[in-house]
Amino acid sequence: MTDRIELTTANEFIARHIGPRAADELAMLQTLGFDSIEALSESVIPESIKGTSVLNLPAGQSEADALASIKAIASKNQLFKTYIGQGYYNTHTPAPILRNLLENPAWYTAYTPYQPEISQGRLESLLNFQTLISDLTGLPIANASLLDEATAAAEAMTFCKRLSKNKASQQFFASSHCHPQTLDVLRTRAEPLGITVVVADEHELGDVSDYFGALLQYPASNGDVFDYRELVERFHAANALVAVAADLLALTLLTPPGEFGADVAIGSAQRFGVPLGFGGPHAAYFSTRDAFKRDMPGRLVGVSVDRHGKQALRLAMQTREQHIRREKATSNICTAQVLLANIASMYAVYHGPRGLTQIANRVHQLTAILAEGLSTLGLNAEQAFFFDSLTLHTGDRTAALHAAARARHINLREIDDQRLGLSLDETTSQSAVETLWAIFANDGQSLPDFAALADSVQSRLPAGLLRQSAILSHPVFNRYHSETELMRYLRKLADKDLALDRTMIPLGSCTMKLNAASEMIPVTWAEFGNLHPFAPAEQSAGYQQLTDELEAMLCAATGYDAISLQPNAGSQGEYAGLLAIRAYHQSRGDEHRDICLIPSSAHGTNPATANMAGMRVVVTACDARGNVDIEDLRAKAVQHRDQLAAIMITYPSTHGVFEEGIREICGIVHDNGGQVYIDGANMNAMVGLCAPGKFGGDVSHLNLHKTFCIPHGGGGPGVGPIGVKSHLAPFMPGHARMERKEGAVCAAPFGSASILPITWMYIRMMGGEGLKRASQLAILNANYISRRLEEHYPVLYTGSNGLVAHECILDLRPIKDSSGISVDDVAKRLIDFGFHAPTMSFPVAGTLMIEPTESESREELDRFCDAMIKIREEIRAVENGTLDKDDNPLKNAPHTAAEIVGQWSHPYSREQAVYPVDSLIENKYWPPVGRVDNVFGDRNLVCACPSIENYQEA
């Protein structure tokens, strides 16, 4: 009798996503002393939380079926021609950037470039981005992206507060000409900090002595181009700082903010090649004066040298960041928008200064022609000067004009019942302008002559604000203008880096799992990419279905009652979660509850976020096994019971174990009046096995760019939705375009909406069974590595059963004491083996935290373990004197090709340096630089493209 042939394709994707094959899985289980994956799960998960997860999800669809399903959803979105503007514009993504960057796993699967030696490609692209921003804004220091324009404005507000000499002031001025969504996010950020945001027309502003800072929009949201020079001087005279939200494309033609006195410039790089995406993700920017660089939020790429004196790039001044300064950090932002910043960077590289200026001139000329034509039809723009946006007083015709436009599949900006607006962009054509005239013309009116107006129309930019300074003079912006050259430049940069397309990235607490191609495909569909976030609701039915279904999926995975998809990073999810707790306490008259308990092992974002949410941090101790010290927690909860707002706790713990006492911890906090925030960074060990919403959590954020397969993008984008129990649901983030209007934490109602299809696809293809399998295999893979390496490196923390969760921590401190070899030396030596290092010195200094994820095969796990064992042998050779304690393969790692072919004076061989295992002979990654000098980089800070002489030397 023949075997039964399987006729269904359900669940077939599971085996594509999960790395170990059946025979390997069984062998790995046997190594651990188990005969089934269920037995391992039963042993790892604490008894008190077993059975809390009931994944009520259908079976997984095949890749083809899931793509067909999401295509049907996408087709429900209506793609109108949009002239809404308001910070979001249609753009052309150049095809070579789409194909060679956005759709290239060498770019989108990379991690944040904390290991500079294996990140030189994307660091160079980010340095180009910083140079682009610095040039266009006229300010010397720019960061490597923020989350969106509105959150960048909020960062600018707190930046001004820190630096203003008007220390007594708690008032921040925001122009009423700023984008409305920016003002909403400012209000959200200001309230917990005791800051009052005063929104008014700057032209009616009297005394400014009560303000510590100001935000101005340039050009204004309604289209006006104002001269702010005198106003900036007034604010400076009052010891206030001035931030300007500026349109990058307009800055190719207009005087940059830095030249009229602005202290900070912020904005969005979206219109540099990044689709609308229903609101995101898009890269924001932040630039400032050199004197303020150490107070900047976000990551900063700087120029340094490697140990051979060769120019090398790195992340600079990391002591500002939350993973080091914790509650004293300049910001809680961790993941930003690197992938989108790189798209904008390459858009500028491809077009160059001339191309960008041509685009800007064309957009402005078309807007001027449109305005002149409307004037002949009896409609005059309210603005005397403008770049690309107009406001029209249309009176009683307003509603009818919107209806007429929509009948032609066109969206105009809704301002009020008497006025409307429109913004042009690089996709606007002559025929589009003529269609707009036809909409506004009364019956019987002749349409203007486009050609005649094109010959006669004058610029509507103010003569006194025309840009005089040059832009983008560096060679990188003047060389790669043919597709061939750009394609090769992108390939050259990608080849410098290590991403998931080449190797496992075993970073603890980062969950660098497979980003399957089928999950990525919908991201570039026009139905998801070309929808404006403020389009009429009936045009986004597909997105509404997608978000409704995804929220239900995530509720099923977490045990929570409601989900908000708005937070566009894990840091924003943390923030939204604590704001929900704060608002809940306030609604009950408990405004005095402001103490947040945080274990000493917590990630630095936790205390930084608590500080932003207006809470006071009280640190609780951990015991010798890395668990929360429950008695210390109990004592502090009782001590602060009248002020206790919340606890922030990561589960499984930051130490990589399932703490037995998690239910007791939650109970202690609840008994003393607090709420439980369970950080979802480690959710990849729990889906299908236990649910935080069912064992005591009141709110959690999830990292969709970890557990749910959105790629890290080299440092973003991320999505950090929150799940809440029903009593917190009324306090989730709101938005002007949602039922709840208050509490927006980012500019768009659904945050980074255009990458949500990735998570929808992952869950739909895995189904409930597959999601549980993913968690189980993540735990198996981590325990397999732990078991293989424990005789070579002590595993610092395990559960009571001797097992870890989905990651393990290797203690290298004894090695440092016995040999002088540091955790940094081991991390750099792994590069010679072709591996990205695990997480270094977090959560414990002198350790490596390893998280392999479920996507890695046994072969890859063994390759990594073999590398670590070989490195231990080299360390042993240092310990016994066989290798010199200072001149050895670890201290000199990583080794470059240039070093190998040059003069060789080391006491170990070239072969040992670069081919420590035979498998590298067939497949070798060559780092482009040697070990980077961090101290040199911070002491000699350069954060823009170096001069042509340095460029040639490099």
Swiss-Prot record:
Classification via Pfam families: GcvP2_C (PF21478), GDC-P (PF02347)
Highest taxon of the lineage: Bacteria
Q: What is its EC number?
A: 1.4.4.2
The record, for SUPFAM superfamilies, names: PLP-dependent transferases
- Catalysis: reaction(s): N(6)-[(R)-lipoyl]-L-lysyl-[glycine-cleavage complex H protein] + glycine + H(+) = N(6)-[(R)-S(8)-aminomethyldihydrolipoyl]-L-lysyl-[glycine-cleavage complex H protein] + CO2
Annotated keywords: Oxidoreductase, Pyridoxal phosphate
User: Which GO cellular component term is one of those annotated?
Assistant: glycine cleavage complex
Gene3D superfamilies per UniProt: Aspartate Aminotransferase, domain 1, Type I PLP-dependent aspartate aminotransferase-like (Major domain)
Q: Which cofactor does it need?
A: pyridoxal 5'-phosphate
Q: Which residues are annotated as modified residue N6-(pyridoxal phosphate)lysine in the UniProt record?
A: 706
One GO MF annotation is:
glycine dehydrogenase (decarboxylating) activity
The record's annotation in InterPro entries points to: GcvP (IPR003437), GDC-P_C (IPR049316), GDC-P_N (IPR049315), GDC_P (IPR020581), PyrdxlP-dep_Trfase (IPR015424), PyrdxlP-dep_Trfase_major (IPR015421), PyrdxlP-dep_Trfase_small (IPR015422)
Biological-process GO terms, alphabetical: glycine decarboxylation via glycine cleavage system
Give the enzyme's main class according to its UniProt record, as a single word. oxidoreductase
Assembly and interactions? Answer: The glycine cleavage system is composed of four proteins: P, T, L and H.
Q: What does this protein do?
A: The glycine cleavage system catalyzes the degradation of glycine. The P protein binds the alpha-amino group of glycine through its pyridoxal phosphate cofactor; CO(2) is released and the remaining methylamine moiety is then transferred to the lipoamide cofactor of the H protein.
Q: Tell me its family.
A: Belongs to the GcvP family.
Q: What is this protein called?
A: Glycine dehydrogenase (decarboxylating)
Report the source organism: Pseudomonas syringae pv. syringae (strain B728a)
| Protein's gene | gcvP
